Amino acid sequence: PHAPFNAPKKYWDLYDRASLPPLNPARPSGAPDLAFHDSRELLGLPPDRVEFTAEQVAEIRHGYFANISYLDAQLGKLLDALKRSGRLDNTIILFVGDHGYHLGEHQLWAKNSNFELDARVPLLIAPPECRQAGGRTASLVELIDLFPTLVDLCALPEPPGLEGVSLVPVLGDTAQSVKTAAFTQAPRPAYFDREPGGQPTAMGVSVRTAELRSTQWRDWASGQVLARELYDHQQQPEELVNRIDDPQWARARMQAETLLEAQFPRPSLGAK
């Protein structure tokens, strides 16, 4: 959900504000400035920019949880209506978010980063007679996989040129994985379309594997890499330390950056 977090009171009452999961607002150690943005979606811009008090942060986070429960209730109404219509057993249900959200973590608010909290989204797929009902999977997924999945579930011919892959194998066996990497991008400035010139100055391209997240920040005009990030998702999924200069991660970094170069080719500059 987006701000304003204005769910009805009964959804706020589901949560004890003091018992919500703790917030770690620290920036990841060693992360470049390009990894961050001005959080204007919630904080605004000068001269009207604000800084939240601790009480306001707690209220906003409480409101986010309330909005999620409100959203869940609306989804329940939709499913009840499908059941009453007699169409539930002939309907593919797919619930997805278009981006994640920061609530003060990493000193960020709202979206527009390549961190996991923005890149990871909820995804529920419930075809009729799903054999893995209620199952969860660690399989990497991209939103470009949704259309091929629906085509597959409907037994339709797959159009040529699709970038995504069907997730049907995962629906049959949640231990399966259909891809080894998922990619995201985030521009800088985050709202470049509202800046003079209407173009970004840099683009962050990121790859997530089962083990790590690797991000390159590239000059928009030349493609030259301006900054790099590498986060260990096995031991620290919160992305709190940039491991880019850690020699123990040198091989993994090289492999991840090979994936990035293949997915997001750069001009031949000679510069790395």
Which positions does each model-derived feature cover?
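Core domains of carbohydrate- and sulfate-ester-processing enzymes
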Residues: 4-52
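Beta-strand elements within well-structured catalytic alpha/beta cores of enzymes
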Residues: 64-71, 75-78, 92-97, 123-125, ...
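A short beta-strand-to-alpha-helix junction
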Residues: 32-33, 58-70, 87, 113-121, ...
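C-terminal cap/loop subdomain of S1 sulfatases and analogous C-terminal strand-loop tails that border
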Residues: 99-105, 131, 144-147, 152-233, ...
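Flexible glycine/proline-enriched surface loops and loop-helix/loop-strand junctions
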Residues: 56-60, 106, 127-134, 237, ...
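Long, internal low-complexity/basic segments
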Residues: 41-59, 67, 71, 190, ...
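A short aromatic-rich beta-strand->coil structural motif
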Residues: 2, 15, 52, 121-124, ...
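Histidine-centered active-site microenvironments of extracellular/periplasmic hydrolases
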Residues: 4-10, 14, 81-142, 191-192, ...
